[in-house]
Amino acid sequence: MDLLLLEKSLIAVFVAVILATVISKLRGKKLKLPPGPIPIPIFGNWLQVGDDLNHRNLVDYAKKFGDLFLLRMGQRNLVVVSSPDLTKEVLLTQGVEFGSRTRNVVFDIFTGKGQDMVFTVYGEHWRKMRRIMTVPFFTNKVVQQNREGWEFEAASVVEDVKKNPDSATKGIVLRKRLQLMMYNNMFRIMFDRRFESEDDPLFLRLKALNGERSRLAQSFEYNYGDFIPILRPFLRGYLKICQDVKDRRIALFKKYFVDERKQIASSKPTGSEGLKCAIDHILEAEQKGEINEDNVLYIVENINVAAIETTLWSIEWGIAELVNHPEIQSKLRNELDTVLGPGVQVTEPDLHKLPYLQAVVKETLRLRMAIPLLVPHMNLHDAKLAGYDIPAESKILVNAWWLANNPNSWKKPEEFRPERFFEEESHVEANGNDFRYVPFGVGRRSCPGIILALPILGITIGRMVQNFELLPPPGQSKVDTSEKGGQFSLHILNHSIIVMKPRNC
């Protein structure tokens, strides 16, 4: 059976080569496409550029082909934007035209073919989902309702680290404890739930399934079936694994969190009032018929993917940079002690009084952007950009990392220097008021989680610096900050071992 399938596929490839050659010649006369390497039939530029189109590799192509270039990845168009002006055009000026999301066979499995919010196309469904998610997740009221919980979780990290005898001597992988903190931060918001320890069986299952989902979705293993549709039958085994992981995740979300919350709601007396968690609002929308149960579960899916690990990576990067720059760490600690007083723990209302802490957060997001190419955009229909034709359903990547690290736009961008946000970049904020710096995107499809991420980053980094001297492990002058990823997400290659010496405040 496999030999027959292979024979048919080879014949299809041959026919497709002829068709692609003819079509490309015909289309070439009509379209003015962005510059880029010369594609070959069927494979496009895939064999030339490979799979790993991370933020740094795309900079090399931008230097060769310009701020707007096109890569043909098999049968898919990939358009890369590398300048502030073009970024404004894609994200804001033509935000409707380029406001959709690309999907593929793997993302279709994990999102139920766009039943979520983050990865759905721009249109009525997205507007409805965004509206329903905004009130329970992305308002200042949510911040005020949950800030004490975030502060409690940060304090719990401090307490647990102090109890660990290795933390002040040979060092610990702080990320492990911070991961539990981030899950608790978000599950408090969603379900008014938290996990007691890193060994909690449900936490371990959840973390493992989320990790497997990310690995499968971000893998290059399925590119051949995505780029060349006639080879898609060979992905059956891979897609079966994806479907199994998706089914187990959705079942876990439903049984242990959504259904449990429904039972709690049903046991309350009619008309009783109380502080609602996010899922209560989402379930009310389901009861009104605005969304269905699948939409509810995919909202939970989105939060697990988009809100937890991204903030965790940024915290990890920020702490690593402070370890490697003790003078900046000392300056930040001095601000905290001076403004708040020695031993007075930073809280969310204090953050506006701590400009250097805010600058450290902004500099971390600039140099070590968690999603360096943002979440990809797509134009549903043929479009124009900078005088070039952009064919319908092109994948649009904004190299946001390069916008914030281009030496033509930033002074010594390779340096971790928070002072830049007091000096030459004093006007720049993380909300995208300057298109050289858009860590959360801009416009309709910007990340609404900015309202949660910034205070959590400030509270967590602030408390770690207040309570500990952060040092590299014995025998090392710095921690390794080699990068891993960059096409989807950017994280540290090897999780840092940090020596955390308690301060006597």
Swiss-Prot record:
EC number of the protein: 1.14.14.91
Pfam short name (any one): p450
GO molecular function: heme binding; identical protein binding; iron ion binding; trans-cinnamate 4-monooxygenase activity
An example Gene Ontology biological process: pollen development
Binding annotation for heme: C447
Keywords noted in UniProt: Heme, Iron, Membrane, Metal-binding, Monooxygenase, Oxidoreductase, Transmembrane, Transmembrane helix
Entry's induction text: Induced by wounding.
GO cellular component: endoplasmic reticulum; Golgi apparatus; peroxisome; plant-type cell wall; plant-type vacuole; plasma membrane; plasmodesma
Membrane topology according to the record: Single-pass membrane protein
Cofactor(s) annotated in UniProt: heme
Domain of life the protein comes from: Eukaryota
Family to which the UniProt record says this protein belongs: Belongs to the cytochrome P450 family.
Function (record text): Catalyzes the first oxidative step of the phenylpropanoid pathway in higher plants by transforming trans-cinnamate into p-coumarate. The compounds formed by this pathway are essential components for lignification, pollination, and defense against ultraviolet light, predators and pathogens.
Record's protein name: Trans-cinnamate 4-monooxygenase
Species assigned in the record: Arabidopsis thaliana
